[in-house]
Amino acid sequence: MVEEVLSYMITNKDGIYVDCTAGEGGHIKAILGYTNNKAKVIGVDVDYEVLEIAEERLKDLSDNVVLIKSSYKNIDMVLRGLGIDKVDGFLMDLGVSTFQLKGENRGFSFTKDEPLDMRMDVQSEKDAAYIVNNYSQEDLRRIIFEYGEEKRFAHSISKSIVKNRPINTTQELVDAIRKGLPASQVHERHRHFATKTFQALRIEVNEELKNIEETLSKFESFLKVKARVAVITFHSLEDRIVKNFFKNNERYNFLTPKPILPTQEEIKHNPRSRSAKLRVVEYLGA
C-alpha cells in the first residue's frame, strides 16, 4: 500500500512528515523518494534492533531523516524535543514487522521455538512468559476473548494454559493451546490455531490498543490545517479504534470513506498484507 500512502498523505513536497512506526525504514525511504530534497521525516520506533536496520538503510538520506527510539505514545515529547511545532502528516503502520517475526529469540512467531517474549521494546519489564505464568485463568480468558477475538474457545484455552504451566517457550505455548482446542480447530486450514492467542498476548504485553488511541489524540496539536494522517491496521480491534476516533472527532474528515485494501498482486508478494486496511483523514483545524 506504499503508493496509496504516498498519494494520500503527501500534500507538501517540502514538508515534515512523521513515521510513528519507522520499522526498517521502508516507508521513510518511499516518502523521501516522493518528496523534494527539503523534506524531512521523523522516524520513531520502540524497537532499537529495527532502528539499526533503518539507520543503515537510510544512511544516504541522513540529512533528511531523524530516527528516535521511543514509543509512538510519546510522540508529543519527541517532536517538542526536536523543536518541531507543526508537521504535514503522520503515518502509523501497526502490527508486527517481518524482522520481528523472523528475528531470533523475539517470541512473536508460533512457527519457531523461542523464549516466550513478544516485547517490541526489549527493555520493558513485562514479557509474554510473565503473563502466561502469572495471570489468573480469568484474566487469561479475558485477554484471549477480547484481544484475540477468540469467542468460542477462550475458556478452554486459558484453562489448558494454566494446567500446563510453567510455559516458557513459544512451542510450549502452542502445545498448551492445542490441548485446549477440539481437533477440528487444530486442523482448520485457513488460519493457524495459535494465531488468536498469540495476537492477544502480544497486544497485552505491549499495551497496543491503549497506546493507539492515546497517540491519535496527540496528533492534533502538531498538524497543520489540511495535513493528513494515514493509519494501516491489521485486525478489527485496531481498525475499530482508528475508525471511531476519527469518526467522533469533527476536526477530521475521512478521505477514505471505506478503508483501502491491498491488491491481489500485493497479497501475492506479501501474504501478511492480506488483512491490512488503510484509512486516511485530513485535519480541518481547531
UniProtKB/Swiss-Prot annotation:
GO cellular component: cytoplasm
Subcellular location: Cytoplasm
SUPFAM superfamilies linked: Putative methyltransferase TM0872, insert domain, S-adenosyl-L-methionine-dependent methyltransferases
Residues binding S-adenosyl-L-methionine: 25-27, 45, 79, 93, 100
Protein EC: 2.1.1.199
Reaction(s) this enzyme catalyzes, per UniProt: cytidine(1402) in 16S rRNA + S-adenosyl-L-methionine = N(4)-methylcytidine(1402) in 16S rRNA + S-adenosyl-L-homocysteine + H(+)
Pfam name, any one: Methyltransf_5
Predominant location category: cytoplasm
Gene3D superfamilies per UniProt: Putative methyltransferase TM0872, insert domain, Vaccinia Virus protein VP39
Alphabetic keyword roster: Cytoplasm, Methyltransferase, rRNA processing, S-adenosyl-L-methionine, Transferase
Record GO biological process: rRNA base methylation
Record's function text: Specifically methylates the N4 position of cytidine in position 1402 (C1402) of 16S rRNA.
UniProt record similarity statement: Belongs to the methyltransferase superfamily. RsmH family.
Protein name: Ribosomal RNA small subunit methyltransferase H
